[in-house]
Amino acid sequence: VELWDPYDDMASTHPLDRTLYVRHQAIRKMIERWGTNNGASAVVEHGANPGMVSHLVKQALTDITTQLLTDGKAGSRASSLQTALEAQQFNVLAQLTGTKVIHIAERDTQVSSKPKLTNEFCNTWSVEGFYEEGVAPAELGWGTHEKWMPANAHAHTDDGPRNQICLAQPGMESWVRSWVPSGDTLGMIIRHGESYTMTHHLTVKNTDGTDAYRPTVHYAYHPSDAAINSVLELRMRNWQMQPKERIFNDEIIDGRDELGVLLMGHDYKSWWTGSTLSIHEARAIIPNQSATTVQVAGSVVGAITWLLDCPSEGVRVPDELPWKKVLDATRPYIGPIHSAPSDWTPLKNRNDLFPGYGNDTSLLDHSDPWQFANFLAPTPY
């Protein structure tokens, strides 16, 4: 899905033409031209995210549904939820549970014994990969519940699912409120393929082919403190990459990578499912790596396991793989999976220092906490 030179003609290329949506649509049309998709197996975009997170969403929907049925909160939905659960109809489960928003919610707290230097970009994984994603337009799957769209948002008008929008601003400058088990976070809307595939596979159609239900899906990434400082310096350099790069490995002395999915809008408000792998746990699994790289590598192992067992299934995205099988193959590398509810909303702990004097009252929607404007930080005008 990546381009050899993604920076060519950046200023003159329309933001929509720089999206992963366009690239995924090109793959879909290529497969359609073949007339069949029964050749050698190939998995598109399967690391930790995109990749493992698609399976974690199915784990989360399974856990939410099971909890609703156990707690007696399902009400008139009980029979339909049970049927959809048994049939593994995750789009129906997402709709019936009331899931409106899904964040790939990640916070990296790994710290190094060697501080970031001036004019150096530091990260716990590929510096070049982060830069390429970060300067691209913020891109997100757009839910059917959304009432308001930012002024700089652009929607697709092609013959595809049109399940995404993009913002005419870099993902590194697009921040949202989110949550991980350690607490509230601010995350960047870095473009990722799961925003396309996950939204597409969780869509429920009306009989006339229109979309009856679709959640908002996007990345909410808070990297390590050194990477945050690197991004700030990159912005000060007017997006000209620093001359020095460093990927943290053996110099990491503490911290963890909380990487999971945050499903919001259902009866429990929020539910986070994912890996909370620490650097110490990661080193016990694979020496000389960070928690981040172990999570990614383990997720690749999961995909390879499926490829070896199913060599003639054609081109697939993570959402089309047997989620339990792939996730089970990944588990030895990501530590115990945390899956539990939280009563968090983007409005719960909000602290506007100048309430009523800014724009907080014009766009905040207290009647529906799961509106996109409630997540944006700062609140847009």
Regions found by a protein language model. Give the residues of each.
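C-terminal catalytic/substrate-binding lobe primarily of soluble NAD(P)-dependent oxidoreductases
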Residues: 63-381
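General beta-strand structural signal in soluble alpha/beta enzymes
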Residues: 2, 42-44, 104
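Rossmann-fold NAD(P)-binding glycine/threonine-rich loop
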Residues: 1-39
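Alpha-helix capping and helix-loop boundary segments enriched in small/acidic/polar residues
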Residues: 14-18, 48, 291
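Domain-scale recognition of functional cores that engage charged ligands
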Residues: 46-55
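Short catalytic/ligand-binding loop motif for oxyanion handling, primarily in non-cytosolic enzymes
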Residues: 8-9, 51-52, 113
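Alpha-helical scaffold elements adjacent to nucleotide-binding pockets in ATP/GTP-utilizing enzyme cores
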Residues: 56-60
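Flexible glycine/proline-enriched surface loops and loop-helix/loop-strand junctions
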Residues: 38-43, 178-182
